[in-house]
Amino acid sequence: MAAAPTQIEAELYYLIARFLQSGPCNKSAQVLVQELEEHQLIPRRLDWEGKEHRRSFEDLVAANAHIPPDYLLKICERIGPLLDKEIPQSVPGVQTLLGVGRQSLLRDAKDCKSTLWNGSAFAALHRGRPPELPVNYVKPPNVVNITSARQLTGCSRFSHVFPSSAYQHIKMHKRILGHLSSVYCVAFDRSGRRIFTGSDDCLVKIWATDDGRLLATLRGHSAEISDMAVNYENTLIAAGSCDKVVRVWCLRTCAPVAVLQGHSASITSIQFCPSTKGTTRYLTSTGADGTICFWQWHVKTMKFRDRPVKFTERSRPGVQISCSSFSSGGMFITTGSTDHVIRIYYLGSEIPEKIAELESHTDKVVAVQFCNNGDSLRFVSGSRDGTARIWQYQQQEWKSIVLDMATKMSGNNLTSAEDKVTKLKVTMVAWDRYDTTVITAVNNFLLKVWNSVTGQLLHTLSGHDDEVFVLEAHPFDQRIILSAGHDGNIFIWDLDRGTKIRNYFNMIEGQGHGAVFDCKFSPDGNHFACTDSHGHLLLFGFGCSKYYEKIPDQMFFHTDYRPLIRDANNYVLDEQTQQAPHLMPPPFLVDVDGNPHPTKFQRLVPGRENCKDEQLIPQLGYVANGDGEVVEQVIGQQTNDQEESILDGIIRELQREQDLRLINEGDVPHFPINRSYSVNGALSSPNMDIPSSPNIGLRRSGQIEGVRQMHNNAPRSQMATERDLMAWSRRVVVNELNSGVSRVQEECRNAKGDLEVSLYTVEKKKKPSYPIQRNDYQPSCGRSLRRTQRKRQHTYLTRSNIEHNSQASSQTSGVQEDSDSSSEEDETVGTSDASVEDPVVEWQSESSSSDSSSEYSDWIADAGINLQPPKRQTRQATQKIYSSSEDENLKLEDRQKKPKQTKKKKGGLVSMAGEPNEEWLAPQWILDTIPRRSPFVPQMGDELIYFRQGHEAYVRAVRKSKIYSVNLQKQPWNKMDLREQEFVKIVGIKYEIGPPTLCCLKLAFLDPISGKMTGESFSIKYHDMPDVIDFLVLHQFYNEAKERNWQIGDRFRSIIDDAWWFGTVESQQPFQPEYPDSSFQCYSVHWDNNEREKMSPWDMEPIPDGTAFPDEVGAGIPVSQEELTALLYKPQEGEWGAHSRDEECERVIQGINNLLSLDFASPFAVPVDLSAYPLYCTVVAYPTDLNTIKQRLENRFYRRISALMWEVRYIEHNARTFNEPDSPIVKAAKIVTDVLLRFIGDQSCSDILDTYNKIKAEDPDSSDLEEDSEMVDLDSDGPGTSSGRRAKCRGRRQSLKCNPDAWKKQCEELLSLIYEREDSEPFRQPADPQSYPVQQQQEGESSQSVPPDRQDPSLSEDYQDGIDTPMDFSTVKETLESGNYDSPLEFYKDVRQIFSNSKAYTSNKKSRIYSMTLRLSALFENHIKNIISDYKSAIQSQKRRRPRYRKRLRSSSSSLSSSRAPSPKGKQKQMKLQPKNDQNTSVAYARTSSPFSSPVSDAAEGVSLYLLDDEGDGPFSPSSFSGYSRSGNSHDPGKAKSFRNRVLPAKQDHSLDGPLTNVDGREPRTGAKRKLLSASEEDESMGGEEKEMKETKEQVHLSSSESGELGSSLSSESTSGSDSDSESTSRTDQDYVDGDHDYSKFIQTRPKRKLRKQHTNGKRNWKTRGTGGRGRWGRWGRWSRGGRGRGGRGRGGRGRGGGGGRGRGRGRGGRGASRGSSRAKRARVADDEFDTMFSGRFSRLPRIKTRNQGRRTVLYNDDSDNDNFVSTEDPLNLGTSRSGRVRKMTEKARVSHLMGWNY
């Protein structure tokens, strides 16, 4: 007999038996139990006497009832994670009981030691290959062992020879500033010897990889470069731009090869096809117009066909194709679009054809990428729906593996940004080199590595601090991938191990970090190049950097930004030399300021390598810039006496004489006259070898842009001779590939293409796994039906419309059409071209700089193509379309045989008059405030009967009318087994923007007996259609209809169009035989007008006795109000709480009336004025407002209280949809919603103001904690500051920290530094509306190019919509010099206001003005951080020293403090109004206290629900602290435009005893806080020194908290972090509305009145900040055009122009006494809220966004296709921001320039 088992063994046997019993092995369990009992292996039991007894297995189970059958399994599952904490396994997340070594569950520390091989181990071969290193081989193998082994075996593994750790030796060779704007495109040529960069300054530059030299500049584009591609033969480069043009250059000579014009909007991606079939090649381009063009070209002649094969994929207005990717063999190309559809085209036929449309994604497709190898037809797609999909063609269909970004590594508890981002989105996708893994970048800053075959998550890579939009796989090493993002970080990752190898942070000295926009590996993998937001090219590689040390840090050619002239075909010539840019002489190398580099650098220019020294000295001259100033510039090359023309010499001599005369007269010009004159009279520079330092020189004047404005007149000697042209045409910039290399690569691509065709053919013949649904899209052979039309010229000037109007009109007069011809018209997808049949016109001068912005925004999301500014024509006539087929006659015959295809023409978003097109408006059935039986308007909580027959009829009607695209596979009857009628309840409602506006419902099944939800649900979309019967019927109406039990012959009446119609029941039979039990339209009726129809019983009403019949038989009679009311829904018990519906409705109506008395609720009082803001309806699908809710309450519209609460929530939802989530208007909407919801929920509450006060009091210190936590950031040194520099400045900083007034000098120095920067130029002076008309702002035209008679003075009207608080550096400087700032915080706020205004008024995040704002903001915040920190330290130091003088102060006879006045925010906590001795006398941010103000004009302003589209600029956004002022002189049309307020040089003193008064002498209404009376009494009883101590304490507290807040704000970008409580957004204290206020204190929460006098012509003018304040913009002002996206990295563009606008809003200064006590009550409430809300005004600011990320969808959002699109708890949870707040922001809000409140 075996030995007795131990206790653990016996228990293990028991657990095994229990585990077997719970599984499929029951027989084995029985046998085991028998053996356990037989061998007495079951533990014995003990009785009370201690005797042992045998027991059965059943007894043991009963005794251990707490042990579940799977107890053993659970033990095994828990062992692994517990062991991992002590001894981590080698592969995290793998759970196995059978592991070995470090994967074993029995492992100990000894097993985990790293393995080391000797040299002989490497010399062994395993199956003819070197062995794989074990997982625990930590260190790279010894290179000696590897080399020796390779000598012995003749082979080695690449991972052994070149371990991944070798990439740690990559370093940055050089960072070169070569562009004036952000650089979004970089590419290597096929040899890797050349680098190409494409920038927003419209230039493409060619660089040498080996030494970083600038070799050539390709000019011609008139807008931002959106994408570039180099052909596989290395002979051509193509660049797409926002100017809608694709330009192709020859790489060898830089000569233009083709200008391809086939798009009507910006180019989004461009690709050369890898296919090598014959001599015909393809270049593809996709655009924001929803088209893809296939351009044919000949590989030998490099000639392009003018007419592309074109597919228009615009399923609805505004659809863009955002990304594209070719397969490795070139037989397939896939595209991703904003309509959520992936389209695949096949190039294996004679012409490209579309073969598939994949609609699995539910949001925009932002990235697609084919695999690198042709052995499988696979590609990966990434979408903003939070998933990526790996697609593969199998059995006649494209099947996909879903990669859910919410998936986490098992055993990995990452909680960083991953859990903070609720709405996950894919930003970029990539394959590794061998396609074994797929890498996705997610908007939570993580990279995820997936197995490309199984879809399993392998690694999660963390390290980035912002979104990643660059993923670049190594060209041959599958382990390596590169990532870069807008946080400035560049990472090299090891995909095998999931670890970081190397990272680089792009820190720019004094300017913060530069966001990295693009990266590319060289073909040999030895280099990679990156580009950033500041215009830099970063070169990385192995080896030393000595060759790169020989080049300057800034490299521009002096001809880079010369103006160009264009012909009718868009080819360009240099305006000065009248030569093609590639035939011009070798240029000179200059820095960013336009200063020539020393002669040693000039030899770096191709063509100047062998020049003599005198030929390397550029000729300098003085020319007039655009502002009329004379500046010094390079105008050409210095020549010998015999070569120069007479005219050149005369000009130079006259110039020299003029300069000397000016010097003798003492009138020194702006430029330095420090040059020596050569013998021949030419100017020479004796200091040529002294390099100029950055940010000085020409940019110091603040009037020109260095290389951007070179010269206006080139000397005749610079004209090229025939000999020169021949020599320059032979210059080789980029060599062609070696013939052998080229042949091998072509054979490889050819083989891949053949394999792809073979795979496609084989899979196409296989039997599908299920029947294939026929595609809904049209075949690609149809002809476009758009009318023949010419492109109209608009009446305002843009870069692409500079041709003289006289010539343009005379040449196009015969072919122009009305402006209602729209490029939005539907057209049959077909092969067509877009070549322009313009007559040949003469060369015309393009007077604007080549850097100005493109004509239209291509960054319009779903807003529509060619969207022009509001109140202007928004559509363009399209061009005539011709068939590009060679067999035109055959296709014509085919078309004649087919029926004519016609489609309903769709209009644009806005008509010519600025009115919104009717199809975009919310339909009446949604807007109606009167309850009706039909059409059915859903409300939350409705219990319904759903009729499948009616829903199917609706879908058929939609498809027949082609109203919108319906996916039959997503209909509920195809997803689940639905009966003919279902009892359901509405648990979610969402509206989608149209046309048409769709209602999306989530319907939960109800149990017919209990009435409770079963847990299942489905979703539907529908809208009200004429002649389509409602298929949703209220359960109450359905039950009533069933009880009537209609019989044949019964008379009935029915409501149709608010009239009673009479008829007779003829018969009853099912509407459809397959649904015999359905009541839907089961009655056949005979109307009295002899018509017959099918009716449903709930649409029929009995005829009461005494009913009046119509005079004519068959006519109708109107429905009375009483009859209509009787037919409405009757609330059930409990649906309105404890009260009746009437009682609740009246209570809420009174609450809304009281709520509207508060200023912060007034913006939500009435509907938006769509005539003023026509594009609002394209953003908000379900508009609502407080007045609409009140009307519906009065009409008893809501069926239950939950429906009312749902609509109240939509107020905040609409605000969040239209605005940034942290903008003040959203916070105001949240307050309105929270207060109203709390009031509705508390049925015992009768005063909504009490509810409002309670909500305020609940969270008064919520943001103080943030302030304290952010103080650490402020004290720490910023990145990039060297320790040596800190040590050097430590003594000075220490002294500054002890001087409370040292900040003034520091701020002056900082302001001077800002003035030296070129980026500050647009913000130095306020904008002049006469110089910067509104058209220029919106269309991007330089103001100098607009003649005065063409300028539009209406800028102020447009400007005021976006900027409530104009600000510029000159105003800040005057305020600082006059001593009107009490602390650096106020200085900081005003400067931040400048940046906030710029971002709020710039509709695009990637426009040039936006980039300038980012750079300047980063520079400012980098310096202001230390200033505020020093100030805080000084205040604290002063506080520590103060108690020593306390006794002496108390003994003083003076009751007033003579110390420095406390911070204006110091008394915020005290909440009391205290006048000060020194009253600031600057412009105030409030409404003007003008004598013209009146209650009538105040009411006429018409407060609108229109929401501010704030770009989110931190605490000082224009929406945060503006007073919404209007011009006080509003009766004078000539003075209606904005004007700049002057700042008095010193503060005015006002008596502390006298009250502050308004213009008419009345006392202004105070903004007293909660404890006004008691606090004032306390202050009066307090001694002067005690009061001073109290104020000082509060001041120090403020400084600490505010400084801490600023620590998190000091980043390169910002979002609005201000809470608000004024009339518009509750943003400013009531004081700012009623009284005059110092403009430099506009952020203070401590209420005070600033009385200000300004004497002009002997008159006294009372002004407030924002009152007539002129726009603070300068040269570029607002930029309105969007950019583009390529593969998910799309970005916004911009427009150009500037201007000012008067402040907006409401203020009642001077009229406070006329409104009585109710007004004072409102003021007190508003002030209280303001006080609590402003504690969180500083929020962390996001960094630069991306090229594609800025775009947001507004049209059909397929979220509803997911059954869980709406939460049952919160039906408005339609997506969340990074901060976790619900949002659905759209780019249309930016495009439409709907900035500001609609007053």
From Swiss-Prot:
Plays a role in the regulation of cell morphology and cytoskeletal organization. Required in the control of cell shape. CDD domains: Bromo_WDR9_I_like (cd05529), WD40 (cd00200). One of its GO terms (biological process) is regulation of cell shape. InterPro entries: Bromo_WD_repeat, Bromodomain, Bromodomain-like_sf, WD40/YVTN_repeat-like_dom_sf, WD40_repeat_CS, WD40_repeat_dom_sf, WD40_rpt. Residues 817-828, 1260-1276 have a biased composition (Acidic residues). This is Bromodomain and WD repeat-containing protein 3. Keywords: Bromodomain, Phosphoprotein, Repeat, WD repeat.
